[in-house]
Amino acid sequence: METDEFFTIKEKDLLFSLYRKLLQLSGETLQKGDCKKLKTHLVNTIQNNRIQRDIFGLNPVIKDMQTAVIVAEEIGMKRASILGLMLHDSVRCGTCTALEVEQIYGEDVAGIIRGLIRVNELYSKSPTIESENFRNLLLTFAEDMRVILIMIADRVNIMRQIKDCKNDEARRQAVSYTHLRAHE
């Protein structure tokens, strides 16, 4: 498993801490083998250099795990939402397909992944549009309210991670979050 360059020493510690917390929060809803299969998907995605740090330098696996903790702990969502969140980058970058995810984890997980990918594609095209049409389009694209809740949790996580960042991109992200939040 050659993921050493992908995670800093600090991130490795954080990764194990988040893993334990997430397992504690969702362990009873996970099916046998979910964690092992998820790890295999993530390692494969990392080893194939399919995901990279974002504009803030945040590690996408750590960011998704932090968001998954918010989803589980603060919103109360369980297996399908957590797995969908953790696997959506692997599907988006082509390491695996939504059909494979559906066969391994079920339609519920695959549906959340499809929703996250669709909403993220829409959102990346126009993240700060304030119109009522965009709000309606976003909700229509999501099809599943869990997708919107996961996106809100993701924005909350990003806001927490970049609170001390002074650059313009951080401010744009903050504005983007407020618009998404206002749409709810």
Q: Where is each model-derived feature located?
A:
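Generic start-of-chain signal for non-secretory N-termini
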Residues: 1-37
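Structural motif
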Residues: 32-36, 57-61, 74-77, 104, ...
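Conserved short loop/turn motifs at secondary-structure junctions
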Residues: 55-59, 85-91, 100-101, 166-167, ...
